[in-house]
Amino acid sequence: MNKAIASKILITLGFLFLYRVLAYIPIPGVDLAAIKAFFDSNSNNALGLFNMFSGNAVSRLSIISLGIMPYITSSIIMELLSATFPNLAKMKKERDGMQKYMQIVRYLTILITLIQAVSVSVGLRSISGGANGAIMIDMQVFMIVSAFSMLTGTMLLMWIGEQITQRGVGNGISLIIFAGIVSGIPSAISGTFNLVNTGVINILMLIGIVLIVLATIFAIIYVELAERRIPISYARKVVMQNQNKRIMNYIPIKLNLSGVIPPIFASALLVFPSTILQQATSNKTLQAIADFLSPQGYAYNILMFLLIIFFAYFYSSIVFNSKDIADNLRRNGGYIPGLRPGEGTSSFLNAVASKLTLWGSLYLALISTVPWILVKAMGVPFYFGGTAVLIVVQVAIDTMKKIEAQIYMSKYKTLSAVGF
């Protein structure tokens, strides 16, 4: 490993460390003891799941309590609008247009953050504490302070994510979510053993949970490394021993084309609304809806299943453009044996991608929901979904591949420099 790659890894770790430091900076004017007591009693619902994705920042009411979710939500909205309006889709493909597009995403993130921050501030009044619940200062002042604090925190996370993507290794936003989930693993393990010691969970249940986790990890690794290789042939003629030879190659198409995006998008759409509804303890109708959409309920997991399939198809169509691949092949003198260059190749690649996306979307949906079904059947008293495991393993594999690619690239540059 050369110095450049080592430097990128250190930069990535440094920014992730900064992210974890921010998780311990609380919003001024709140009763942290009341907040902790509230989250201890609500760890099994949407609040607990939202807290997990934020790296326990919510339970501390940190300035990054909203995490990166507002940015993800704004990205979802913009992607859907891009698919609807051709001018917006065209803007994304241009260099200057992409900058404008990202600026719109940032402005939308600010708007969503402010709306969510005000919602959280109002919800804190229902938490048992002083006259204003967990709020220790004037309500109007607190709403301004909390909105500014959470907006600052979310903007800092956006900046950290962009810096990691540009100067480090891997996708910055995915790594932030990864770090948040991983940071909660020690406390989750400790909490599980406490349940064993108190007799809430027996040894057989513990063994069952471990086996489910290991099986989930194995399935994710197996599928994430699976790909369909489409052989291609180039018409370049290489004169060797008076014979014309063709250069053979292939197009690798992953079984899971959409990567980790569908479960992240689906979680973002389900978790925060459920969290806001959970705080409406005075309204029986909203509380009933919140209970209905609890992560431990069937409705949440059915919606999760369907949303993941939708986003898998939606995002796959964005990241895999069969027409562009077919055009690039034709320009470079390449073709798929037995198929005409251009439209024929594009139709074939599109058909292959559609079949793979079908199985890939089902894999993502099943991995995100089946572990919960198994754990619920065992009678385990806490929520365990495969979404967190899926995100952690996928991001780890993706980051390792990018590091490996950069190592190979540096070796190639070294060999080119010495004349090989």
Swiss-Prot record:
Pfam family, one: SecY
Record has Membrane as a keyword: yes
Signal sequence extent: none
Topology in the lipid bilayer: Multi-pass membrane protein
Localization of this protein: Cell inner membrane
Keyword Transport among record annotations: yes
Alphabetical keyword list: Cell inner membrane, Cell membrane, Membrane, Protein transport, Translocation, Transmembrane, Transmembrane helix, Transport
Alphabetical GO biological process terms: intracellular protein transmembrane transport; protein targeting; protein transport by the Sec complex
GO cellular component: plasma membrane
TM region(s), chain numbering: 9-29, 61-81, 104-124, 141-161, 173-193, 203-223, 257-277, 300-320, 355-375, 377-397
Chief location of this protein within or outside the cell: membrane
Function, as annotated: The central subunit of the protein translocation channel SecYEG. Consists of two halves formed by TMs 1-5 and 6-10. These two domains form a lateral gate at the front which open onto the bilayer between TMs 2 and 7, and are clamped together by SecE at the back. The channel is closed by both a pore ring composed of hydrophobic SecY resides and a short helix (helix 2A) on the extracellular side of the membrane which forms a plug. The plug probably moves laterally to allow the channel to open. The ring and the pore may move independently.
NCBIfam families to which the protein is assigned, alphabetical: 3a0501s007 (TIGR00967)
Family according to the record: Belongs to the SecY/SEC61-alpha family.
Subunit architecture: Component of the Sec protein translocase complex. Heterotrimer consisting of SecY, SecE and SecG subunits. The heterotrimers can form oligomers, although 1 heterotrimer is thought to be able to translocate proteins. Interacts with the ribosome. Interacts with SecDF, and other proteins may be involved. Interacts with SecA.
Protein name: Protein translocase subunit SecY
